[in-house]
Amino acid sequence: MMESRHAQRKNEHLSLAAKYYDQVHQHHYFDQVRLIHDSLPEMTTDDVDLHVQLADNLEIECPFYIEAMTGGSDQALKINRQLAQLAHKHHLAMATGSLSIISKDPQSFSSFEIIREENPDGIIFANLSANASLDQAINAISLLKANALELHINAAQELIMPEGDRDFNWLDNIQYLVSELEVPVIVKEVGFGMSKTTIAKLQTHDVHLINVSGRGGTNFAAIENRRNHDINFESLLDWGQTTPESLLEAHSIRRGKTEIIASGGITSPLDVIKAGVLGARAVGVAGYFLNILQNEGYEALDQTLGEWQVIVKRLLALLGCSSFTELSRVEYVLGTDLLSYARQRHLR
């Protein structure tokens, strides 16, 4: 049976993400962050606890997790099944791709449902657009028995997308969903990063979990521009803030019980640690894990996830930190470009 045009678009996204993977990873922005070594950590690896408390009712067993990738097609179902199996095995949280498609193509739900089937007791974040209705949000959470809801904000992607939305009045709806839902709400960019202005707006609208999702990983500007045969948005291919820049922005404005999550261009356990040093409470990884799964296979990703957990724990011990949250006290220096950005933005 031929898949719907919505499912075909999801397959296009997967294909183009793979096509542009090497291109978007030519620049590794976390190289602009250097950690200061202390030769006397006074710590054992047994002292390290990887658990992270993101909210009163949301704890994850490891500071990095499998970030939102895909859903809505047969190909996505296969990918989500494998990712969910690995999330279950390694006790990792996992975010779904956008569930917005199920209101237009109800048959696509099986590609999301498989995540809960393969990981019945794990931490799962459902994912919807920031303009989702309360009924859509409640339905998505209920169908997946989700532990949290990600609301993605993706104005740049939508504007480049030929069939994208053109209305970005999101803040009031976000605040309404936060107030009405029983699970924590994470507001997430999709690879364009956040400024301190954005983060301040979210905080004043009662958002306390913010994923800055910076430039450096999957590039939806490039993906949607390739799909757009009418207008060329090539000038926006490097639009937005990188993940380190976004974390510095967040650190300058974060207040109260707001917790920052990082994603975008995370390709190593050291990147996870550096994100924590810059203020992230947790770190999402999507493109890097998907690339391994698609090109090297299930067993290779299985091995990678296990190794990352071991390395993150050992790096925490090396830095004298018994938990991921203690990374905020680790000293660091910035490379020339990132330091210049921070000074011009009055971030340090």
Curated annotation (Swiss-Prot):
Q: Which GO terms describe its molecular function?
A: FMN binding; isopentenyl-diphosphate delta-isomerase activity; magnesium ion binding; NADPH binding; oxidoreductase activity
Biological process terms in GO annotation: isoprenoid biosynthetic process
Name the reaction it catalyses. Answer: isopentenyl diphosphate = dimethylallyl diphosphate
Annotated residues that bind Mg(2+) are located at: 158
Q: Which UniProt keywords apply?
A: Cytoplasm, Flavoprotein, FMN, Isomerase, Isoprene biosynthesis, Magnesium, Metal-binding, NADP
InterPro entries xrefs: Aldolase_TIM, FMN-dep_DH, IPdP_isomerase
- What is the annotated localization of this protein? Cytoplasm
Coiled-coil ranges from the UniProt annotation: none
The EC category is: isomerase
Give the residues the record marks as binding substrate. 9-10, 157
The cofactors required by this protein are: FMN; NADPH; Mg(2+)
For the ligand (FMN), the binding residues are 68-70, 98, 127, 188, 213, 218, 286-287
Origin: domain of life: Bacteria
Its EC number(s): 5.3.3.2
Q: Which Gene3D superfamilies match?
A: Aldolase class I (3.20.20.70)
Q: Name one GO cellular component term.
A: cytoplasm
Q: What is its main location?
A: cytoplasm
Per the record, the similarity remark reads: Belongs to the IPP isomerase type 2 family.
Its quaternary organisation is: Homooctamer. Dimer of tetramers.
Function according to Swiss-Prot or TrEMBL: Involved in the biosynthesis of isoprenoids. Catalyzes the 1,3-allylic rearrangement of the homoallylic substrate isopentenyl (IPP) to its allylic isomer, dimethylallyl diphosphate (DMAPP).
The molecule here is called: Isopentenyl-diphosphate delta-isomerase
Q: What is the species of this protein? A: Limosilactobacillus reuteri subsp. reuteri (strain JCM 1112)
